[in-house]
């Protein structure tokens, strides 16, 4: 038995017939070839398989492809394209690069996508908010401090990149 699913993955539409119990992580990796969605524990503990599902960070090893049908999925492969059509990195990816927020890289895609969700909700998070938001993503290498610094760096970059208001009635404008 197969079920039809349809998604927008990294801005591109896909339609497939899948087995009803196929996990989103396996659909992304095996059907679409998007291997940046890592498989670590397959029990929702490590967070290596984190993707954005309609903008919310989810662990793709616990979401069935049929549950995600009709949704917009963003993987690590598509993140830069959403931020910079000319091939540049997303500010969170830049932060991980600049602040050495990765070592072996296995947890990195999940950490980055969980961080993107956090910064979408809280553009200026505290260190504790960052640690809490990433508590479902495990890293065996970095000790987390560089990851926290990477997210803080990204928050500053994202704030600096926002266009300034051109409204002359803006109360913060000099008079």
Residue ranges and their predicted role:
Residues 1-166, 173-175:
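Signature of N-terminal electron-transfer/Fe-S-associated modules in redox systems
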């Amino acid at each position: 038995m197969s079920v039809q699913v349809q998604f927008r993955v990294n801005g591109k539409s896909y339609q497939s017939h899948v087995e009803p119990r196929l996990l989103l992580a396996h659909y992304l990796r095996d059907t679409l070839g998007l291997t940046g969605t890592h498989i670590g524990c397959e029990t929702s503990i490590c967070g290596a398989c984190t993707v954005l599902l309609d903008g919310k960070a989810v662990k793709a090893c616990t979401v069935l492809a049929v549950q995600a049908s009709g949704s917009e999925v963003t993987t690590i492969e598509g993140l830069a394209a959403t931020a910079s059509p000319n091939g540049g990195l997303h500010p969170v990816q830049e932060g991980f690069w600049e602040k050495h927020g990765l070592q072996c890289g296995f947890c990195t895609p999940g950490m980055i996508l969980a961080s993107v969700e956090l910064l979408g909700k809280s553009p200026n998070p505290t260190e504790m908010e960052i640690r809490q938001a990433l508590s479902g993503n495990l890293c065996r290498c970095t000790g987390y401090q560089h990851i926290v610094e990477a997210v803080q760096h990204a928050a500053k970059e994202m704030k600096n990149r926002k266009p300034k208001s051109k409204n002359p009635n803006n109360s913060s404008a000099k008079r």
